[in-house]
Every structure is written in C-alpha cells, then in structure tokens.
C-alpha cells in the first residue's frame, strides 16, 4: 500500500515493532527475536534488512565497538524505547538535564523521517548548531514548512560542505554520531535545514527518525533487550 507524506512517498510499512500484529512477534522464534537494517544515505543506494543470524553478526560488532544501549519498556511493550542522556554539537555536550529526555521517553522508529525532541532539548541543539554554522560562514535561510525552522542557504558552494558534528548519547555511553545526511535535510540548495524538530510539549514522546539512522546498521535483540548501532554499514 503506497503512502504519501511531507517528505515523499513510501511503498508501504513493514511492522517490526513488538505489537501483536508485528512480524517479529509472529515469527520471533524463527529469528531468535533479532533483526537488523541499514538505511542508505542516497535514495538510490543499497541498504539491507536481516533477521536472525545476519542480525547476530551485527550485534557482535555493536558489542565490540561499545555501541549498544538497553532496550527499555517505558509506557508499554510495543515500541523500542531507549534511554537518551545527552546531545553533543561539535564535540561539546549541551547543557540539557537528563530528566528532559526521560520525562516522556524516546523510541527508535524507522517510519518517522525527522527526529522529534523535547522543546527544551531542541532549543539547545538549534542554538548551538546555528552558532557553529555561523562560525563556518553559512548564511541563514527562512524555515522550510513549520517543522524545520533552522535553515541555511548553500547557494554557490562547491565541493565538500563542512558541518558541525552532531551526536546523540545513550545509556551506557553509546554515541550515535550523525552522518552528514543525518544532520541536514536539503529541500533545495537554498534551504538546507537542521533535520530535527521540536515536539509540542516536553511531555510528548521523543522519536529518533530514519534520517538520523542513515548509514548505520541498527540491530534489535528483543531477547537480550538491547539496541545496537554500527556506523558505515551501507
């Protein structure tokens, strides 16, 4: 079933959550409750979706690189909750209390395009990112739709575009260091926008969307209750 959204068209949705109708619940024993996927940076690129043994290989890599975090049960067992503890911009940890992230919980969801953050966290992120972008000489641009409000004009730039690094930090110290395509959403050359958005309220559930997951292998081990991620997988 095709579906349209603000960021384009999808062919359909494959349910991999922990709800009763999910493929992982219906065939979980066959695949040992494990799956992994990688979303490519380029729409024409090749990603993958692995179940069972293939996902176990990804899990071993995530453990070796210390890039895994506990899978939490926050407001029910359906979603894949994780404990986010901080955000770094340019290698510097932003002044955001951990309680801001734990207030409503955070899930990993490949069906959501843009990551949603509590307003208090998003405000610190956009301020730090805009400051670093200004230091690099980029010109600000008007927002693109209501959701993306921190945009820049890249007209006339050639070659590699340098960006401040952005990292999400999780329980256990695991760090998701964004690929460049996970930092900016380029609507067009005059509108390259910070690919994060604020929820309406700090009490709204936060979401790590597919844009921020690009090029990483995301591994889910339901039995061990861990989520792992490995960079440069596709």
Identify the meaning behind each predicted range.
Residues 41, 89-91, 168-172:
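Short acidic, glycine-rich loop/turn motifs
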Residues 85-87, 92, 112, 174, ...:
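Well-ordered beta-strand scaffold positions
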Residues 84-103, 198-201:
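A short acidic-Thr-Gly-centered motif at the start of a beta-strand
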Residues 1-78, 105-108, 113-116, 120-167, ...:
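Non-catalytic N-lobe/flap surface of aspartyl protease domains
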Residues 178-212:
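A conserved acidic, glycine/proline-rich C-terminal tail/linker
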Residues 74-78, 87-90, 211-214, 219-234:
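C-terminal helix/juxtamembrane-tail motif
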